[in-house]
Amino acid sequence: MADENPQAQGAEGGGKGKSSSMRLQERHQQLRKRGRTPPSAYARRDMNETAQQHNRNESSNRSPSPLAPPRSPSPDAQARKRKRPGGGARMGLVDRETLRRRQEERERSQQEEAMRFSQNRGVTDIVRHHYNAVPQRGREWRKTESKIKGLRSFNNWIKSTLIQKFSPDEEFVARSIGTKDWADETAPPPMEDKRLLVVDLGCGKGGDLGKWQLAPQPVDLYVGLDPAEVSIVQARERYNGMRTGRGPRGRRGPLFHAEFAPKDCFGEYLGDVPIVQQVGIDPNAGPGGSVMSSRWGGGGFDVVASMFTIHYAFESEEKARQMLRNVAGCLKKGGRFLGVCPNSDIISARVAEMNAKRKERETAAKKEEAEPEDGEVEEDDNKIEWGNSIYRVRFSGDTPEDGIFRPPFGWKYSYFMEEAVEEIPEYVVPWEAFRALTEDYNLELQYRKPFLEVWKDEKDDQELGPLSERMGVRDRNTGALLMTEEEKEAASFYHAFCFYKV
């Protein structure tokens, strides 16, 4: 589920939502500078580097510099080596034993680190190979032949809702509603054309590019990172199609500058990605960083997005903390971390319920006669599985009797989604443990809701409501949600969230 393809978000609106949608679009346009928008500074950087390289390659008409005078020969190298004799003889047995123990400790530490790295790469490689192998399907197929077209459209609308609600900064939101809550009277005037810097962790095939193009506050730079190399190639092709007019660009100004790179965003530090390094990433984010860095430091990005991906980070505490170091390190103060992931409340309730049923069967000694309920498959005592014809969740190992996952890391299950995910390992993200962990990285929870509650709250919004009709989520005439009951059950497995960097 790391990559959902967009529906026709930029298509013409209609029906009862057209006038309100147009008014909001006009309001957003009034907040932007009129006239030609200058290109992104990051796009100009590429052009400047090309020009500088060209200038460096031009032939010069200057006279050659005179040769430097010859230097006196250096003394013989052997003469420079001075070693006090007898040093080794004075090393006592205790010192030799100490050195031997230290060497053994270093070797043991290196072996343990190599083992952890190998284990981490094992799951990462499985996920990467899976998404590299997912076929690229066209929009027409998704709209007509897909078995989960309602779920695809709904998931895309949820992500669009997050971007619409939480990607703008406080200054932009305050100006859009005509207040000055963003500053006191002594503050300088606002930047009329301030644009967002966004990094997308697990960008997949670039399915959210169109959503960012339609963000209320314009995007200046989009950085897409994903461990799957094939997905990065396809994301770059999708973006190039938008640049040349072959892809959906909507009607909201010029296309932002975008850069893509293959990267394990949870197992590795992002500071070695050139564009991330250029925008700014704080290497001291989180526990262990300096007091001044935690108070005043930060990265250069306004938004970090992670759609359907953070569950891969909960393989271990080390990976979860590396993920949060990357998120907090990239964000400036006031920046937003938004995304979607499996809802641990749903998982915990299912696990507790099925463990209780298993215990009842054991007590009654009628396990052979018991019939599984709809959507449940029971092959042995330890395996817990549920789902329907389009999705399936399966725990092969032991699970907590009460459904409370302690410790919060390493609870692996396999997940299947028709046409999207083929039985790959994922990990439970126990929400309260995750929220507590984010506090170590100066991230404060602002929003968290299950997918179906997001729909209930936002379906009548003056902009998001008409957007749901344009995206094929709701029937224009009846207002009905265009998903089957099985698709609704699959959607209920997820929730959306947003944190602020404080």
Curated annotation (Swiss-Prot):
TM regions (residue ranges): none
Keywords: Methyltransferase, mRNA capping, mRNA processing, Nucleus, RNA-binding, S-adenosyl-L-methionine, Transferase
Domain mRNA cap 0 methyltransferase: 146-502
Signal peptide: none
Entry EC number(s): 2.1.1.56
Translocase listed as a keyword: no
Domain of life: Eukaryota
Basic and acidic residues bias: start-end ranges: 93-115, 360-369
Region (Disordered): 1-118, 360-381
CC annotations in GO: nucleus
Subcellular location: Nucleus
Principal EC category: transferase
MF GO annotations: mRNA 5'-cap (guanine-N7-)-methyltransferase activity; RNA binding
Residues binding mRNA, per UniProt: N155, N156
Biased composition (Acidic residues): 370-381
Physiological role: Responsible for methylating the 5'-cap structure of mRNAs.
Family recorded in the similarity comment: Belongs to the class I-like SAM-binding methyltransferase superfamily. mRNA cap 0 methyltransferase family.
PANTHER family with a match to the protein in the record: MRNA CAP GUANINE-N7 METHYLTRANSFERASE, MRNA GUANINE-7- METHYLTRANSFERASE
Protein name: mRNA cap guanine-N(7) methyltransferase
